[in-house]
Amino acid sequence: MPKMKTKSSAKKRFRVRPGGTVKRGQAFKRHILTKKTTKNKRHLRGIVNVHEGDMGSIAKMLPSAGL
């Protein structure tokens, strides 16, 4: 049986941390930013962890990550 391939879109969007958590960038920060307040854009900065409920689907998309 061949090896399972990693989803290209997932490997560009997610990074696995040494502790087993997965980090991702915030959404809603690409365009239509003029309507959004400075406070809202500031809160969308930075990296956040993936929620536990989404970890199953992330693990299927990243088979070599060992999640």
UniProtKB/Swiss-Prot annotation:
Pfam families noted in UniProt: Ribosomal_L35p (PF01632)
An annotated GO BP: translation
Gene Ontology MF: a single term: structural constituent of ribosome
Presence of the UniProt keyword Protease in the record: no
SUPFAM superfamilies assigned: L35p-like (SSF143034)
Keyword annotations of the record: Ribonucleoprotein, Ribosomal protein
Keyword Ribonucleoprotein carried by entry: yes
UniProt xrefs under InterPro entries: Ribosomal_bL35, Ribosomal_bL35-like, Ribosomal_bL35_CS, Ribosomal_bL35_sf
GO cellular component annotations of the record: cytosolic large ribosomal subunit
Family to which the UniProt record says this protein belongs: Belongs to the bacterial ribosomal protein bL35 family.
NCBIfam families, per the entry: rpmI_bact (TIGR00001)
Annotated protein name in UniProt: Large ribosomal subunit protein bL35
Gene behind this protein: rpmI
